[in-house]
Amino acid sequence: MVKVNVIFHSIHGHTYKMAEAIAEGAREVEGAEVEIYQVPETLPYEVLEKMGAIETKNLFAHIPVVTRSMYEDVFAGADALIFGTPTRYGNMTAQMRTVFDGLGGLWSRDALVGKVGSVFTSSGTQHGGQESTILTTHVTLLHLGMIIVGLPYSETRQRRMDEITGGSPYGASTIAGAEENRQPSENELAMARYQGRHVTQIAKKLIG
């Protein structure tokens, strides 16, 4: 059995939909046990309400929120960890950063060394920092000792030129639009499924 956990942060639901697609692809691998978690939201209700995010947050309210008491099971207990975060100025969101910053105890005893790590993202525009967000998140994964897996060009959908689409060798991504009203396309969701499957296959090989 290979255990894969998908951990995401989402406000308007785009990263959540990609997370579901990632998990769907991971579950296609025989013997895979896949769970999805969301990180705690740090924005107050009033701010989320002004952002028009209450309704969209409710769409994935059923997804468990990963708390510090769960870090051992969710992080140290997995063979592969796939992280999803929207872009914030070319980096992960503060909500996701807070979770990573809380992993010091696991880091200090090398609990994540040798585990497979992968990242996916979303942004408001085509050039909204998708690649830099994934790459800067990779830096954190490297400090934790993880083995990074991206989205290889064998997933040919990232080569498409006939439509606006996310996706790069660094990981799957989606473009939400400036008003957050564009939903992940089938092409983007297919790349997310590929990434989930690819990461899980590699993790399965590594654990023998």
Swiss-Prot record:
For this protein, what does the record note about how its cofactor is bound? Binds 1 FMN per monomer.
Q: Which cofactor does it need?
A: FMN
Per the record, what are the reactions this protein catalyses?
a quinone + NADH + H(+) = a quinol + NAD(+); a quinone + NADPH + H(+) = a quinol + NADP(+)
What Enzyme Commission number does this protein have? 1.6.5.2
UniProt key word Zinc-finger = no
Organism domain of life: Archaea
Which InterPro entries does the record match to this protein?
Flavodoxin/NO_synth, Flavodoxin_CS, Flavoprotein-like_sf, Flavoprotein_WrbA-like, FMN_Rdtase-like_dom, NQO
A GO term for molecular function? flavin adenine dinucleotide binding
Q: What class of enzyme is it?
A: oxidoreductase
Keyword Membrane assigned = no
Which UniProt keywords are listed?
A: Flavoprotein, FMN, NAD, NADP, Nucleotide-binding, Oxidoreductase
Provide the binding site for FMN: 10-15, 87-89, 122-128, 143
Q: Which residues form the signal peptide?
A: none
Q: Which residues bind substrate?
A: W107
Domain Flavodoxin-like: residue ranges: 4-199
- Which SUPFAM superfamilies does the record cross-reference, listed alphabetically? Flavoproteins (SSF52218)
Per the record, its GO cellular-component terms are:
membrane
What the record says about family reads: Belongs to the WrbA family.
Under what name is this protein listed? NAD(P)H dehydrogenase (quinone)
Organism, by scientific name, is Methanosarcina barkeri (strain Fusaro / DSM 804)
